[in-house]
From Swiss-Prot:
Pfam families: AKAP28. Changing residue 43 to P: Abolishes RII-binding. It comes from the Eukaryota. Residues 1-11, 19-29 have a biased composition (Polar residues). This is A-kinase anchor protein 14. Keywords: Cytoplasm. Binds to type II regulatory subunits of protein kinase A and anchors/targets them. The lineage of its organism: Eukaryota, Metazoa, Chordata, Craniata, Vertebrata. Present in cilia (at protein level). Expressed in tissues containing axoneme-based organelles (cilia and/or flagella): trachea and testis. Highly expressed in airway cilia.
Amino acid sequence: MSETQNSTSQKAMDEDNKAASQTMPNTQDKNYEDELTQVALALVEDVINYAVKIVEEERNPLKNIKWMTHGEFTVEKGLKQIDEYFSKCVSKKCWAHGVEFVERKDLIHSFLYIYYVHWSISTADLPVARISAGTYFTMKVSKTKPPDAPIVVSYVGDHQALVHRPGMVRFRENWQKNLTDAKYSFMESFPFLFNRV
């Protein structure tokens, strides 16, 4: 009889354990589901970001101009082409810019013509802007390429190291705004340095 009771109680315990294992979640399965959810969310976020990028490029395609060739190049034409590029790329009319030729560097196989573009926003309160941002343009004219080959154009922002190429990277006005805002914040932090006349 005790043997029958033991086997009956063993069966009851097995059934209790089976029922408990069905009602209690398995921690390994839960961790796996959490990891799977995280991967799925990351994937969905990447897809959404990519879709937003495609829509933005459809609405605002890369804007560029037809840059002059080696045979057409002059310093004055370089100034005009930079103006033309920005008139096509900059949508907000509040930005004022001026282009000036800085220098010509003679390298072994080419000449580098460097231009500086000043950016500022004038307002009714302050018609002459106290703060400006800048962009350095470099036009590379090769000594060895044929006259009908296009020149190589690149630009970098003030205090930046990343080189951009027109037609490959969209010029963003907020780069200039961020720089002018940072300069303005710096000037406000040290008014005793900048309020002198």
